[in-house]
């Protein structure tokens, strides 16, 4: 069945946040978990998942009352407890958020009038790192990634992803399955870093281009990463 294609310019929802629990205030399942590593998919703060693949490194993940003033009392903290000194090609460490198709229709993906999307968030770390945020279209296996930098102070990042216009791929499914997956890449092997970051536009997925240019949270037991205040809105 061919999905109906409509003009997205009529959407009234510009500016509304599509991320649920971006302030990391709710952690009903896992407020604190230690020794996370190997190949693991683990819920942390509600709607957020730790997704690791084949790494020897280990981390502790906690909901922490250390959010930036005026933004959120809480944040998610990831603390490296065991380093990974020999990185295999297929390794990955991702903080993931899924968005249901019925909640992202306002983007108008793949149709005339498709919208840009801006994702903003607050981050800090123990040092300066480059990590990546990937906007992954799970319905069509298309993606676009952006690098962002950390400092030792809370910094607001604002990353604008281009409209994925009518290119022959389909709109997002209008249902409760995950159509958009936000991947915060914190560590990756060469399978995901050996290409050129797919940053200027959306394209059919090539793994080597998903996380090129990132550092590794697992390079030292001194390393930590904090995030909160995540928002995703239509528009630049």
Question: PLM features: residue spans?
Answer:
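Extracellular and organelle-lumenal recognition/adhesion modules and their flexible linkers in secreted
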Residues: 2-236
